[in-house]
A protein has these predicted regions:
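A short beta-strand-turn-helix
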Residues: 40-60
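N-proximal helix/coil linker or "cap" segments that precede and/or mark the start of modular domains
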Residues: 20-40
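Thioredoxin-like thiol-disulfide oxidoreductase module
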Residues: 83-85, 90-154
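Solvent-exposed, polar/charged alpha-helical surfaces in well-ordered, non-transmembrane soluble domains
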Residues: 47, 51, 70-73, 87, ...
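Conserved redox-active cysteine motifs that mediate thiol-disulfide chemistry
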Residues: 64-80
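Short, solvent-exposed mixed-charge patches
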Residues: 160-162
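Short, flexible loop segments at the rims of nucleotide/cofactor-binding pockets, characterized by
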Residues: 37-40, 74, 103
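Bacterial Sec-dependent N-terminal signal peptides
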Residues: 1-22
Length: 162
């Protein structure tokens, strides 16, 4: 009987901790910009951005994920609010958020470019040449530190030296 009570308390404590963690994540998520657009045709948008990248002599950096993904929102927040990272991003890339969610899995875009998020988790990144060729993929995990991102690692990634 003592074992049953212990197990019940352990389960209750775990559920309470998970609920608090989920609530904290939802509060954090609400404080960030929502850069993903589930209604958008990702393949069509990437085609437009490739033309822009060619004209501007840039690469296309595709961040794959969704507004449901706290790590996706954290990365976007870092690179768009840190002046040094934002400068690199704006100078070298056309930056795009390719949505992956139940509402829109962007299957056509993923059939063309692959979906590294399915292998690595989200966010995942695609670096595209202006001609549409995939230069490389990057998993988010390599850039993370604690509950956020390591600014030095992200800088190296954006500079193409990671």
């Amino acid at each position: 009987m003592k074992n049953l009570i212990f197990i019940a308390l352990l389960c209750w404590g775990g559920m309470t901790a998970w609920a608090q963690s989920s609530e904290e994540t939802n509060k954090e998520r609400a404080g960030y910009e929502q850069p993903y657009h589930p209604e958008e045709d990702g393949d069509k948008r990437i085609s437009e951005l490739l033309k822009q990248a060619k004209k501007e002599r840039k690469k296309v950096l595709v961040q794959i994920g969704g507004n449901w993904c706290i790590w996706c929102l954290r990365f976007n927040h870092l690179v768009t609010t840190n002046p040094e990272l934002k400068t690199i991003l704006d100078k070298k890339y056309v930056f795009y958020h390719l949505n992956f969610s139940p509402e829109n899995k962007n299957e056509k875009a993923f059939a063309k470019y692959g979906n590294p998020g399915a292998q690595f988790g989200y966010p995942a990144f695609l670096m595209l040449k202006a001609k549409g060729e995939v230069l490389f993929t990057q998993k988010s995990e390599d850039l993370e530190s604690g509950k956020g991102y390591d600014t030095k690692k992200v800088k190296k990634f954006l500079q193409g030296r990671l």
